[in-house]
Amino acid sequence: MKGVSEELLEETALAVQRMCRDYSATFIIDDNVHLVKRIGADGVHLGKNDMPIAEARKILGEGFIIGSTVNSFEDIANTLRTATPDYFGCGPFRYTTTKQNLAPILGTEGYRAIIGQMRKHDIHIPIVAIGGIGKGDIPAIMACGVNGIALSGSILNAQDPITEMQNVLSLL
């Protein structure tokens, strides 16, 4: 929800938070560390150009999840030089319209290579695949060794988003 008032953003976040709690779902807010702290969301996801992880940790303290966007093993290594996130959001899997200035497409081979390098360097931070993922991609992506997937357009653009989400959950 870019470009909306802080009041509308907080009102919407609180509504989503209630739904997440009703379904025992984790509520991660993109980029807005102060909103996460104010409403007590579960955590924040920080993009490459967002607040540094260490600064977010100082503001939030322990007990909040902090995720970090990466597109390569080099990004992972660079991130770990200054801070340790709770997970890496890694992608894009394929082209997606939900993100401008898209990084190079990873596909399953990219995920396998990144996870292989992480194992080689004894890095055990969860990887969440993101970017252009559809329901049919999930088995192959999970077989690469990722720990989870993030979906947006494939759910929101479905004719029946609730049924689509139920179908996705049945694959996990």
Question: Regions from the language model: what does each represent?
Answer:
Residues M1, K48, T69-S72, G91-F93, ...:
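Short secondary-structure boundary segments
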Residues M1-L8, T12-Q17, D22-D31, K37-G43, ...:
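Conserved alpha/beta-domain cores
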Residues V4, L8-E11, V44-K48, S68, ...:
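Alpha-helix N-cap and loop-to-helix initiation/capping positions
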Residues L9-I28, A56-S72, P104-V128, K135, ...:
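Alpha-helix-loop-beta-strand connector modules within alpha/beta enzyme cores
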Residues F27-D42, N71-P85, Q117-I123, I127-A129, ...:
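Catalytic cores of alpha/beta
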Residues G43, G47, G61, G67, ...:
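Glycine-centered flexibility sites
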Residues K48-K58, G89-L102, I138-L171:
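Glycine-rich phosphate-binding active-site loops on the catalytic face of alpha/beta enzymes
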